[in-house]
Amino acid sequence: MAYAVTARAALFTLATTLTLSAPAQAAVDAHCTESSMTLPPGALYPNGIARAADGTLYVGLITSGNVLRKRPGKAWETFFPGADTVFASNALRLDERRGLLWGNSPDFLSGGKTRANHIYALNVADGTLNRSLALPAGEMGNDIVLGADGTVYVTETRGGSILRLRPGEAAFSTLYQDPRLAAPSGLGAAGIVLLDDRLLAVANFGTGKLYTLSYNDPKPQLTEMQLPRLIENPDGMGLAPDGALIVLENGIQSGQGRILRIPSPKAAGMHRIEVLREGMESPVNLTITPQGCAFVSESRIRHRLLPGHESEVPDSFRLYQLPLPLTAAQ
């Protein structure tokens, strides 16, 4: 979840070049080329994005519970129209083994309405609502990651915690809470990704810091990643096939959204930040194929946060596809 947009002059173009420090190499997936696709009219502020093994894309929207689907070679269609408890569709995560599409429905930019924040799951087979779980009062989900066993992990952005729902459980519980994952702005814990079966990475949207958490330990330990600079509103994150951490830098104040790459995120010491793309309009979420093809949603929602600019709705919204640079597996 992240909510920033740049000025028209900073529009991201596919011609933007990529400068990488050696030894990063281009992704080897011959079917993944730099491209973009425009969402259909009325599909505003994309956020959640997931991709099935057959190439089907699912996209959720920040201010609507609609979930769109695009099958290979087909037009965009409405997969799920939303519901009373699904009024936003952020952070989509696909569990193909169990036939579920998980999503986050936070009461963000609610327009004066007060609604409980929910985490929900859709049945992939028919687009129906499988379950919708209300979070406790005051808690708001941000991003989601799925474990191999079907466990659902959610970043709770207001209090700075990691929530967990194991298979068979009826409600989320707090796995870990730390004031370092909160932020004065109210948007703290954001992007989350499992690095392995012991460590996860989590971003603090408000402070610009990244952390690792030993989430399977009886007493999980939170460790700040050493970075050469703060990241301006780190949002969605993903793990590349070579183990590199891909971070979307939302850039609310500067309006300069970027796609970043951090090699060897589990290593100790100072980490290097590589800029894969810049000049984007608030990149918020992504999904990465096993071959290293990334699909990124660009929300273009910053105008909603700037007084006097609320009515300046962009005329189109896009998703971007790009091959990630890969090194030997880390």
Q: What residue ranges belong to the model's regions?
A:
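Short loop/turn segments that connect beta-strands within beta-propeller blades
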Residues: 71-75, 123-128, 166-170, 214-219, ...
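A short helix->beta-strand "capping" segment at the edge of beta-propeller domains
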Residues: 27-44
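Structural motif
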Residues: 111-118, 163, 209-212, 254-260, ...
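Short loop/turn segments immediately following the C-termini of beta-strands
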Residues: 62, 105-108, 157-159, 167, ...
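Asp-box/WD-like beta-propeller blade repeats and closely related beta-sheet repeat scaffolds
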Residues: 114-149, 155
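Beta-propeller fold detector
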Residues: 35-38, 77-83, 130-134, 172-179, ...
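Beta-rich, blade/repeat-based domains predominating
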Residues: 40-56, 62, 83-109, 135-153, ...
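Short, conserved, GDST-rich strand-edge loop motifs in beta-rich repeat architectures
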Residues: 104-116, 250, 298-314
